[in-house]
Design a protein with these regions (language model features):
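Conserved alpha-helix/loop element of class I SAM-dependent methyltransferases that forms part
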Residues: 1-9
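Class I SAM-dependent methyltransferase SAM/SAH-binding core
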Residues: 14, 20-70
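A short acidic, Gly/Pro-enriched loop at the edge of an enzyme's catalytic core
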Residues: 69-81
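A short SAM/SAH-binding and catalytic strip from SAM-dependent methyltransferases
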Residues: 80-93
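A short glycine-rich, Lys/Arg-flanked "PGG" loop and its adjoining helix->strand segment in the class I
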Residues: 95-110
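Short, glycine-/aromatic-enriched active-site segment of Class I SAM-dependent methyltransferases
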Residues: 116-138
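Short alpha-helix
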Residues: 140-156
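Conserved Class I S-adenosyl-L-methionine
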Residues: 162-209
């Protein structure tokens, strides 16, 4: 997602929808960002303990309980936002970027997004192998490149730099499916039946005008 990162070292970055903070740790340690790990469902105290166990202090990474639709930060606070595997839950609203997210990004700042997606729109005729693991309602959160291009292009405040299929599709799925958490276990039926040929991961890069 950020292999060609345009965010300078030392930037203040929001990891939006950070979960338990794995991405937050990576971008703080590897890229030297000051990271705000913002998530509605995780416990900031537990995340802080995890960050400290990884040798990262609050000077480098700060856990924040935050709703993506009502972020508790000053306007133009962040140099960049990175959002991995969560934007598809709240960002399908065409108004979201301009009204809920970009106000907190500095002019010229970047937004990097990675979402699970589909190679093509098949929602009107869902492959049976996908239905082994997910309901039609759950699959609505997986959309194709043209869908996301249309969504982000509706923003009046963002320059669309890139919307493309990520190269790491098979590697990411392989790493995920060996996990023993209930979600990974549930996904195995579809993927073992060949469902992966319909799926991808989509990279979105935006720059605030």
């Amino acid at each position: 997602l950020i292999s060609d990162c345009k965010i300078p070292k030392g930037s203040v970055v929001c990891d939006l929808g950070s979960g338990q903070g794995l991405t937050s740790v990576f971008i703080a340690a590897e890229y030297g960002f000051k990271v705000y790990a913002a998530d509605l469902w995780s416990d900031p105290c537990e995340n802080r303990e995890f960050f400290e166990s990884q040798g990262l202090s609050e000077a480098e990474i700060i856990p924040v309980k935050a709703d993506a639709a009502d972020l508790p930060f000053e306007k133009s606070f962040f140099d960049a936002v990175i959002c991995v595997d969560s934007y598809n839950y709240f960002g399908r609203d065409r108004e979201y970027l301009d009204s809920r997210l970009l106000p907190f990004v500095k002019q010229g700042g970047y937004v990097y997004i990675a979402v699970p997606g589909m190679k093509k729109n098949c929602h009107d005729n869902l492959p049976q192998e996908l239905l082994l693991s997910w309901s039609p309602e759950q699959l609505e959160y997986m959309q194709e490149i043209s869908y996301w291009t249309d969504i982000v292009s509706a923003s009046g405040q963002a320059e669309v730099i890139e919307v493309s299929e990520m190269e790491s599709n098979e590697e990411v799925w392989a790493d995920w499916l060996v996990q023993e958490n209930e979600y990974a276990v549930n996904d195995r039926a579809a993927m073992n039946a060949g469902g992966g040929r319909h799926l991808n991961f989509i990279k979105i890069v935006l720059r605030k005008k």
